[in-house]
């Protein structure tokens, strides 16, 4: 016989960004609890609102499954003494399992007999097991916790109610300072405390109190209501997924409505209006069917449609206050002079250990010119890079960006165009922030990409130079994101610039404001970002092998990893890797530089390998390179089968090591083959 279990935790309002991850976590913790305690079940369903986290288990067994376990003990010769009685070792073993020597039997394992005991454990009732089910709540982890009242414990928010039901039976349990029952809280304004009659009636009981407990249902209600408004008003609404997920975790009973604002604000840049609505007010942006921005918005109320007209007016009033600010800054900022703003950046701190933003820009200007040369930009593009690098942070001192910091770069582009800057310069000001996330949009222009690279390189090298190096998950200056942006941009634009050479040359630049340091740590940090770009689906040994190659060109490293993944499926992969690995391992024994002396060869296999290496021409096609290297496998194996590399003749030994080293020098441009696993 099975039953349904309900566990609901009622809390004060949770931050929206915490709700969905916590709901998912709760489901996972419950599944683990049931599996660890041998309670079988059919399904686990989770629920969440800003004021509750809940999980329901359907088809829960009324008793644990019985457990039978075999335990292996000491060998028979240790388990029995000279008289054939059980030794202290055997007695201690069975006692530790809660059994006696009468339970011992001997089983043969690989030709030797060992003590074995079998332990049977009858399953407990579900009621007894569930006495500790609040463990799943204790084990939840949150980004931040808090104290309340005089309690010593911490949790994400103060806890008010705990409901634990097995079908319609309320279980009496305690969590923190709360005793469980069947009372849950309804909507803060429209509902009241209510009894949950049974685990199966949970959603319906709360619905009567204006709470939609199922987040998916709540989300669909919002989407359906928005679509209904779209149809009625003949408009188009951008349903941004991140905004939708945030809004559904701000409300327990959603009602969408259409608001409006004065058309005069449409003269303000669209990005300002969208940021005001979406980022600051959590409103959905409204356009006409052709995509033109309209003086409207859609918001979602936490409640029903009663007195909705008052809610609409209140939301319109709040939005207009923000739009007034945007309009004011738009007009005032146009009176500013870019040169004056750049000069004022001397007084703005980039970081107290590194210097001012002006000094940061000064270094970026030099780096960008070097990069523009390496990337073979045209003279016109180089001039645009130089100009952009000279001014690109000016918008940080505008009123608009001070109020709406999400618009940095975006407003820089607009103000630059208004000031008569070239479109390429203006676009670069916006694009230098890209990508803004691990998989975010990349710059579209070469000028913008070079400026983005220069800005990110100086940021990375500057922070590392003063010892501000990320550790663990701690990365307050977003250096991982910046470095990920570097490798993505280099790969996307096909700039095959070796990163080791690039970083070394950057360290060779001279600045009055800062001396770069910690080059080795920087290279290791960059390698870690390339490994992340390769992806965890590529086996670890392949990732390590290509990162230890002598190729520091991002695109070639990525191609080599894919080529090895593909080759690893071939029948000849194992034997080819093993022969190359043997060559790599022996080449490590080279103690000093020696040229290969053909006259010292003693057999045809040495000569054949020598000629094969001379003929080996590797290109930037990593798939073709692997074909060529794998084709050498029979020749390499013949060499090893017929040649003693580590001979007593020192001259002969060094010559053979030099021969292998010449092979390894070429092969290492693809990967460090001795790091590849063939087992």
UniProtKB/Swiss-Prot annotation:
Keyword annotations: Aminoacyl-tRNA synthetase, ATP-binding, Cytoplasm, Ligase, Nucleotide-binding, Protein biosynthesis
Superkingdom of origin: Bacteria
MF (Gene Ontology): arginine-tRNA ligase activity; ATP binding; glycine-tRNA ligase activity
Main location (coarse class): cytoplasm
Protein location: Cytoplasm
Family named by the database record: Belongs to the class-II aminoacyl-tRNA synthetase family.
NCBIfam families in the record: glyS
Subunit composition and interactions: Tetramer of two alpha and two beta subunits.
Designated name of the protein: Glycine--tRNA ligase beta subunit
Organism the protein comes from: Streptococcus agalactiae serotype III (strain NEM316)
Gene this protein is translated from: glyS
């Amino acid at each position: 016989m099975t039953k349904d279990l309900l566990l609901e935790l009622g809390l004060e309002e949770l931050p929206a960004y915490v709700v969905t991850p916590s709901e998912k976590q709760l489901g996972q913790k419950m599944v683990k609890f049931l599996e660890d305690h041998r309670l079988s079940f059919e399904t686990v369903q989770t629920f969440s609102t800003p004021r509750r986290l809940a999980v329901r288990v359907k088809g829960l067994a009324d008793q644990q499954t019985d457990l039978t376990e075999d335990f292996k003990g000491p060998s028979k010769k240790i388990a029995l003494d000279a008289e054939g009685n059980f030794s202290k070792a055997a007695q201690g073993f069975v006692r530790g399992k809660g059994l006696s020597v009468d339970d011992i039997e001997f089983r043969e394992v690989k030709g030797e007999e060992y003590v074995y005991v079998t332990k049977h454990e009858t399953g407990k009732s579900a009621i007894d097991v569930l006495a500790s089910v609040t463990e799943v709540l204790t084990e939840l982890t949150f980004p931040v916790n808090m104290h309340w009242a005089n309690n010593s414990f911490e949790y994400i928010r103060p806890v008010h109610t705990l409901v634990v039901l097995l079908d319609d039976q309320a279980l009496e349990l305690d969590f923190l300072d709360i005793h469980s029952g069947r009372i849950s809280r309804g909507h803060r304004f429209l509902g009241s405390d209510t009894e949950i009659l049974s685990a199966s009636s949970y959603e319906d009981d709360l619905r009567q109190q204006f709470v939609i407990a199922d987040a998916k249902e709540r989300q669909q209600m919002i989407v359906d209501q928005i679509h209904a408004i779209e149809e009625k008003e003949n408009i188009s609404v951008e349903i941004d997924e991140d905004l939708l997920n945030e809004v559904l975790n701000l409300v327990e009973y959603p009602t969408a409505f259409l608001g409006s604002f004065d058309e005069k604000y449409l003269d303000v840049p669209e990005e300002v209006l969208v940021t005001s609505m979406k980022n600051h007010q959590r409103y959905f942006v409204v356009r006409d069917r052709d995509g033109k921005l309209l003086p409207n918005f859609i918001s979602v109320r936490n409640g029903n449609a009663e007195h909705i007209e008052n809610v609409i007016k209140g939301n319109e009033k709040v939005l207009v206050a923000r739009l007034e600010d945007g309009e004011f800054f738009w007009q005032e900022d146009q009176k500013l002079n870019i040169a004056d703003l750049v000069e004022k950046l001397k007084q703005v701190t980039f970081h107290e250990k590194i210097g001012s933003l002006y000094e940061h820009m000064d270094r970026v200007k030099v780096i960008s010119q070097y990069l523009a040369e390496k990337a073979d930009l045209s003279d016109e593009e180089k001039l645009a890079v130089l100009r952009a690098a000279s001014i690109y942070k000016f918008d940080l001192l505008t009123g608009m960006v001070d109020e709406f910091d999400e618009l940095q770069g975006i407003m820089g582009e607009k103000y630059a165009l208004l000031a008569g800057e070239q479109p390429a310069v203006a676009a670069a000001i916006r694009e230098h922030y890209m990508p803004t996330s691990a998989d975010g949009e990349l710059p579209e222009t070469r000028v913008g990409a070079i400026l983005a690279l220069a800005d990110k390189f100086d940021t990375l090298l500057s922070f590392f130079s003063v010892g501000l190096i990320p550790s663990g998950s701690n990365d307050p200056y977003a250096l991982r994101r910046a470095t990920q942006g570097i490798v993505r941009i280099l790969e996307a634009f096909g700039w095959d610039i070796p990163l080791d050479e690039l970083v070394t040359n950057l360290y060779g630049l001279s600045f009055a404001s800062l001396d770069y340091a910690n080059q080795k740590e920087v290279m290791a940090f960059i390698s870690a970002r390339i490994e992340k770009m390769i992806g965890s689906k590529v086996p670890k040994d392949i990732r390590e092998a290509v990162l230890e190659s002598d190729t520091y060109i991002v695109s070639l490293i990525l191609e080599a990893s894919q080529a090895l993944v593909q080759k690893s499926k071939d029948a000849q992969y194992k034997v080819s890797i093993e022969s190359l690995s043997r060559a790599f391992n022996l080449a490590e024994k080279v103690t000093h530089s020696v040229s290969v002396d053909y006259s010292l060869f003693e057999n045809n296999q040495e000569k054949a390998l020598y000629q094969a290496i001379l003929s080996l021409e590797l290109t930037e096609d990593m798939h073709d390179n692997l074909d060529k290297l794998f084709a050498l496998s029979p020749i390499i194996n013949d060499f090893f089968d017929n040649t003693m590399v580590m001979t007593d003749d020192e001259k002969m030994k060094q010559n053979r090591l030099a021969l292998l080293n010449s092979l390894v020098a070429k092969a290492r441009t693809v990967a460090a083959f001795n790091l590849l696993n063939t087992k």
